[in-house]
Design a protein with these regions (language model features):
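N-terminal binding-site loop/beta-alpha segment at the start of enzyme catalytic domains
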Residues: 1-80, 188
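Short, well-ordered coil/turn segments that N-cap beta-strands
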Residues: 11-16, 46-48, 74-80, 112-117, ...
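Short, acidic/polar
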Residues: 29-42, 95-110, 166-174, 281
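Alpha-helix-loop-beta-strand connector modules within alpha/beta enzyme cores
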Residues: 62-84, 140-155
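Active-site groove signature of glycoside hydrolases
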Residues: 108-134
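Beta/alpha (TIM)-barrel catalytic core signal, keyed to glycine-rich beta->alpha loops juxtaposed to Asp/Glu
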Residues: 124-324
Length: 324
């Protein structure tokens, strides 16, 4: 397993992170013995970062991850780094500190921990606070950071970050304002714009080098949607435990279109560079040195084993990257 520094936190993360969300689905809808077996194997393979959220399975992912880690003897302050997230509703934006504190304390109870290594703000960033899924503006972020700082003083969190989804200009402004330790950013073969220049007529959201900007400011970078919700497998079929449908982020309007677009990378298989598109997707993301960890959700042990194998093969050759 490869390891990367997590920004300026002093933490070191495995290049492959273990996603506990609904898309892969294992930690939300899987059988508990399968969860335990897969998490245990991930730790054996050198995975050190596990990412969950209060909204995954309405808290069930946190409950399951916490129970498995305790059963495996992985207590806080071990080499295992746990991150979770807080998401606010529209009516909670008027009392941010109270809402975040309440949410974090509930997450800690579900995880069965007194503290969490990384807490992340899970709402979009932008000017619209009246939407059903309210965005946070720069003033909100300043208050959110102050709340996280208080939670750190109370011994409930160690570090904090944001999920960098929303308007591109607002995301860059948030990174420039700073005050947090990390970002999660969509970055994959279908939309590499968070790290690489794209054409003026690029059809999807252009993140305009966001993760480069964050890394330059000492922030850790967690790449999300590494497999575009599974579309970068090149197959439409979903595992029974996985989310039955996926809403694309910063790529095509539909999952099926993403699957079709993924097949454009078939040449990497034909040339013997990779075994399959999943390998191409994972190795592409970890080829970018600003990425601290590539977050991949799994549905079963086999998928985890393959993801770890592919991550262990390291970045794609420079010559290949130049053609992508």
């Amino acid at each position: 397993m490869l390891y990367r520094p997590f920004g300026s936190t002093g933490l070191t993360l495995s290049a492959l992170g273990f996603g506990c969300g609904s898309i892969g689905g294992l930690m939300v809808r899987g059988a508990y013995p399968d969860m335990r077996k897969t998490v245990a194997r991930a730790i054996e393979l050198g995975v050190t970062y596990f990412d969950t959220a209060s909204m995954y399975g309405v808290g069930q992912s946190e409950v399951n991850l916490g129970a498995v880690l305790r059963e495996l003897g992985q207590e806080p302050n071990s080499d295992i780094i746990v991150g979770t997230k807080v998401r606010l509703k529209t009516d909670e934006m008027t009392h941010i500190e109270h809402a975040i504190t309440t949410s974090v304390e509930a997450s800690l109870r579900r995880l069965g921990r007194e503290s969490v290594d990384l807490i992340q703000y899970h709402n979009r960033i932008g000017p619209n606070r009246t939407a059903a899924d309210p965005e946070a503006n720069l003033d909100d972020l300043a208050q959110i950071v102050q709340t996280f700082e208080k939670l750190k003083k109370a011994g409930k969190v160690r570090f904090w970050g944001i999920t960098a989804l929303g308007e591109t200009d607002a995301l860059h402004a948030a990174v420039d304002q700073g005050g947090f330790h990390s970002i999660q950013s969509a970055f994959n073969l279908l939309n590499p714009s968070a790290a690489r220049p794209v054409a003026a007529d690029f059809p999807y959201q252009n993140y305009d080098g966001l993760i480069n900007r964050a890394a330059a400011r000492g922030m850790g970078v967690i790449a999300i949607r590494v497999l575009a919700g599974g579309a970068l497998s090149g197959a439409s079929e979903r595992h029974p435990v996985a989310a039955p449908s996926v809403n694309p982020i910063a790529s095509a309007p539909t999952y099926e279109t993403d699957v079709q677009q993924a097949r454009a990378f078939q040449f990497l298989i034909d040339e013997g560079v990779v075994e399959n598109l999943v390998e191409a997707a994972i190795r592409f993301v970890i080829s970018h040195e600003a990425v601290s960890t590539a977050l991949v959700g799994t549905s079963n042990l086999e998928q985890l084993e393959l993801a770890a194998t592919y991550a262990g093969r390291g970045p794609l050759p420079e010559e290949v990257l130049g053609r992508l």
